[in-house]
Structures are given as structure tokens and as C-alpha cells.
Amino acid sequence: MARRFIDISMHLENDVPSDPPGLSPKISYIDHQMSYPDLAQFFPGLKKEDLPDGEAWAVEDVQLNTHNGTHLDAPYHFASTMDGGQRALTIDEVDLNWCFQPGVKLDFQRLPDGYVVQPDDVEAELARIGHTLKPLEIVVVNTRAGTAYGSAEYTRAGCGMGYEATLYLLERGVRLTGTDAWSWDAPFAYTAKKFAETNDASLIWEGHKAGRDIGYCHLEKLHNLQSLPAHGFYISCFPVKIKGASAGWTRAVAIFDDALQAGSP
């Protein structure tokens, strides 16, 4: 089989709701005509008509935070410590071996928005797809949020991975996970309601906080996971190397290649 790629990243773009209000990326586009003054300052005497087609260059000014778009969260995002008290890794310190491994997809599209996934749900889905987890496999979760992308409901859509479900994966050697939802955890609107009823702060970000016990990374805001089979592919998701940061943007892709699969354990 020839090597084939499926893009599982979302665009960074203006005017598409992928973050809560006030947190979205802002991109300014400067085209080949607009940029002439910037080019001319390097070359005194240059006239616009001297340039081929009268064009300079295209460039963009981008205002982002490290959690805009498809990105990889480092253990440092979840807490200052990991592995029971060790200093948490920042994104530039994450083991790159974690970021290129066989992928496994858990299909939780049927679960309602705000549902908190438990170990039994993970076990049932693994049984359904006939797969036993192996260390370092990248486990991605396909939620209803995938089909909500592009709408105002995106950040409130999809189920979330609970503390125990996350530990279930980590205890089996998984070190990198992912979701097509805004967050690995259930949407805040649902968790806020539970917190108001119980005053139990352990419910807040419970899946993320599993990283305090066993350090791991997760991808958020993946896209197009419905195009993937349950297994039989690799995922590549190397993060941008930002010094001391809690996350890095990534162009996550699924790779289908017989030679790669033959070499996997």
C-alpha cells in the first residue's frame, strides 16, 4: 500500500468558533501589494514596477495562545508536578518518541455532551473494536464535538475523559492521547453545574489532573477523526518547540503505511 495521509488538524482561522469568546486566534493577512513598503525599506530606490508583476511578498501577522487550534498539551499544563511529585515537563522537554506511534481511535460519538467517560466505557469500546492497548500507542477519542466544529456550540459539545478513564490508559503505558473536543475533560458548562451541586473541586479538570499521577500529553481540537478506522495507522503530532511552554501547536496527521505497521510491536 502506498503511503497515505489523513489530516486530523483543524485550521487556524478567523471567524470560526473554536474557543470561548475572547480567546480565538486573530490573523491579519498582508498580500503581495500591501507588503511593497516593507520590502522597499531594504532596497533604497526600488520601485514597485521594478518587481515581477509588481508584487512583493505575502505574510501574516498572527495573535495566538499556545492552546489555539490543534495543539499538544505538555504535563506542565495540567500541574507543576507529574509522576507523583516530579517536576512536570514543558512542551520543549516532551519525549518526541511519544509523538510518532501507532494510533487507536475510541468512538464515543454516541455519548451525550458533558458525559464523563469511565474505565468501563473504555474497556467496552476496546472490546468492540477488538484491540488490546500497547505501551506508547496514541489513543484518540472521537466525540460529538467533531461534527459541531464550525458552530457556536463547539466548545460545549462532546463527552470528556474522566480521571479514572485517563488513568486506565496511562497505566497501560499510553503516554499521548487526543480528542476532537475543545478539552480532554467534559465541557466546563457541565462540570460547573456539577460543582455547584456538590462543591467537589476534584470534578474540575479531572482528566487533566491524572497527569499529576502519571505524566502524559494530550492533543486537543483534533478534526476529521470520523475518517479514521479504529486502528491500523500511525499518528504524527510533533509540537512546535516553545521554551518552557505548556503546549505547542501541531499539524497532526494519521499515516497509513504497510511498512510502518509491519515494524510496530
Residue ranges and their predicted role:
Residues 1-265:
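Active-/binding-site microenvironments in catalytic and ligand-binding cores
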